[in-house]
């Protein structure tokens, strides 16, 4: 491909590896859903720590990596990988958030550039460091922070999960109230004062 030679391995072996990877992906997705559910509860109760955020980013990255691995097997299997491709498509849940929205929720001064740098740093961690929550916290922008440091979410992720709220309105709400706790404490009049809310 493009002048590069790739060794195509035995189809039966690849199918076995692909099926194992699919099973791993299913397990990782279940774990990620549980972690996200726990994070939501902690956010609402205002009990989130940096360790909770790092653990969520870790699980998201592990899911991303196994999806990439399965995609590689599908490519190598060609026509023999159709079933695996279908299974992968089913497991690519569009409702599962990416690490970017977690970073926008928690980084001290989030902007597209440092979010991009954080995502790249997370993706570049080796297998040894991806299991170390302190390393994860450091590379995404929390160097020098303890894992038990309390954090306040801005509310991007939870708002993004409400389909009836357009992204632009979510952004305005976060900009207006600053934190999820402040948003939850807002009165109806406070909410209506935000452009695009309540027919405003």
Give each language-model segment a name.
Residues 1-6, 10:
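Extended assembly-interface/linker segments at domain junctions
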Residues 14-19, 24-34, 38, 68-194, ...:
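Long, highly charged, low-complexity intrinsically disordered interaction regions
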Residues 36, 43-72:
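Long, charge-rich alpha-helical interaction segments
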């Amino acid at each position: 491909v493009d002048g590069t030679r790739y060794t195509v391995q035995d189809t039966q072996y690849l199918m076995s590896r692909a099926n194992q990877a699919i099973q791993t992906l299913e397990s990782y997705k279940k774990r990620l859903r549980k972690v996200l559910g726990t994070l939501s509860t902690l956010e609402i109760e205002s009990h989130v720590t940096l360790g909770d955020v790092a653990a969520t980013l870790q699980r998201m990255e592990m899911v991303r990596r196994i999806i990439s691995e399965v995609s590689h097997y599908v490519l190598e299997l060609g026509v023999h990988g159709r079933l695996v491709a279908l299974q992968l498509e089913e497991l690519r849940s569009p409702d599962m958030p990416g690490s970017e929205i977690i970073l926008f929720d928690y980084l001290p001064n989030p902007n597209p550039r440092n979010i991009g740098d954080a995502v790249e740093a997370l993706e570049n961690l080796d297998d040894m460091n991806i299991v170390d929550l302190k390393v994860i916290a450091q590379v995404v922008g929390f160097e020098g922070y303890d894992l038990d440091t309390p954090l306040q979410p801005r509310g991007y992720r939870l708002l993004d999960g409400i389909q009836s709220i357009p992204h632009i309105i979510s952004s305005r709400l976060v900009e207006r109230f600053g934190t999820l706790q402040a948003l939850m404490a807002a009165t109806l009049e406070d909410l209506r004062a935000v452009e695009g809310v309540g027919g405003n």
